[in-house]
């Protein structure tokens, strides 16, 4: 976690300042869950993008299911450019499977075989030409999985909230935000189909 309040307490990205604590955490997780079942998600560093690379000899002592690396520092939070060269150095140094996390959009060539889908990918879906079909299918799947309109609407509203920088969705967002049923949502979406 890159948030200052968390890292000041020595948690999340604050573990970059406490490598012995990080190592105890890895040991406990791997011991408790068994080899290859515990995962670590981290940043490239707290302030610099070479800090994780310096910790790789310690991290490599533990058989992780996956090492997920957000290719920014904690200090950057979610702004600035991801450092793909630093990510590649960490991936090359790792004895565990590595998953990329950071800026990545639909259609981009992934910087690693494994990619954690995050906000930037989800945002890019809203601009796709086939978004109406995808969203309709997602509503259907959510209705089959969840019980009632309220949780389905919550899921859809969260998804659509990521798309409000796109003109169509910015225009629809006030209507989507206040709709109370799945059928009402479907009506809003149908009325705006074809990029209207």
Model-found features: residue ranges?
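Short glycine/serine/threonine-biased micro-segments
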Residues: 10-12, 43, 100-101, 116
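Glycine-rich tight-turn/loop motif centered on a GG-T
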Residues: 3-22, 75-84
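Short connector loops/turns at beta-strand edges and beta->alpha or beta->beta junctions
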Residues: 1-4, 67
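Active-site beta-loop-alpha junctions enriched in small/polar residues
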Residues: 1-2, 41-47, 72-74, 101-107, ...
């Amino acid at each position: 976690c890159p948030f200052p309040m968390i890292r000041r307490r020595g948690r999340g990205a604050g573990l970059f300042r406490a490598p012995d604590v990080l190592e105890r955490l890895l040991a406990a997780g791997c011991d408790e869950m068994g080899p290859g079942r515990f995962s670590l998600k981290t940043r490239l560093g707290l302030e610099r993008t070479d800090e994780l690379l310096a910790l790789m000899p310690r991290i490599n002592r533990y058989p992780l299911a996956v090492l997920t690396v957000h290719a920014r520092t904690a200090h950057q939070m979610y702004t600035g450019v991801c450092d793909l060269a630093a990510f590649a150095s960490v991936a090359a140094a790792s004895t565990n499977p590595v998953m990329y996390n950071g800026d990545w959009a639909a259609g981009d060539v992934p910087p690693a075989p494994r990619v954690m889908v995050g906000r930037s990918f989800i945002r890019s879906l809203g601009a796709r030409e086939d978004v109406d079909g995808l969203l309709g299918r997602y509503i259907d799947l959510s209705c089959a999985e969840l019980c009632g309109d309220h949780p389905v609407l919550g899921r859809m509203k969260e998804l659509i909230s990521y798309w409000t920088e796109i003109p169509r969705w910015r225009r629809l967002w006030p209507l989507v935000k206040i709709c109370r049923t799945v059928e009402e949502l479907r009506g809003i979406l149908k009325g705006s189909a074809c990029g209207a």
